[in-house]
């Protein structure tokens, strides 16, 4: 039953995004037969180091969505403090509901069933605009962000260039 409700909700969210696209990203299904796997393209936000980039990601939804959050994994190269080396995005709203066992996040910052694909992607765009280096997924990127901005910029520029070459 939950699987069917999740499927219907995801179909509705995809339909809504197609009817009313949001600036900065596009979304579609990886496979027309599987509404639980989405392909997402995010444009690097203006006036950021990621500007001009076209970054692809896979959004994977659990069968109990929206009770539990999806995972988002960049398939494009990404150098960012809040993205693991395997491309998995680490932001508060993608963390399971409840208290943070590490004490970094308030429960109110974590996943709630009111979030949508749109709110998730807007949070990722915001993450690209301003990294959180307090609890990084990529410690090396966070260290560069804090201590060696020129090297950080160089690596991000390479990611942007490579994303453009993939078009």
Swiss-Prot record:
EC number: 2.3.2.23
Isomerase recorded as keyword: no
Pathway: Protein modification; protein ubiquitination
The family this protein is said to belong to: Belongs to the ubiquitin-conjugating enzyme family.
Keywords of the record: Acetylation, ATP-binding, Nucleotide-binding, Transferase, Ubl conjugation pathway
Pfam family of the protein (one): UQ_con
Catalytic reaction(s) noted: S-ubiquitinyl-[E1 ubiquitin-activating enzyme]-L-cysteine + [E2 ubiquitin-conjugating enzyme]-L-cysteine = [E1 ubiquitin-activating enzyme]-L-cysteine + S-ubiquitinyl-[E2 ubiquitin-conjugating enzyme]-L-cysteine
Name of this chain's protein: Ubiquitin-conjugating enzyme E2 14
Domain UBC core: start-end pairs: 5-165
SMART domains reported in the protein's UniProt record: UBCc
Post-translational modification N-acetylalanine, affected residues: 2
Annotated InterPro entries: Ub_conjugating_enzyme (IPR050113), UBQ-conjugat_E2_core (IPR000608), UBQ-conjugating_AS (IPR023313), UBQ-conjugating_enzyme/RWD (IPR016135)
Molecular function GO labels: ATP binding; ubiquitin conjugating enzyme activity
Keyword Transferase attributed: yes
Positions annotated as active site in the UniProt record: 90
Biological function: Accepts the ubiquitin from the E1 complex and catalyzes its covalent attachment to other proteins. Involved in the formation of multiubiquitin chains. Signal the protein for selective degradation.
Record CDD domains: UBCc_UBE2G1 (cd23795)
One GO-annotated biological process of the protein: protein ubiquitination
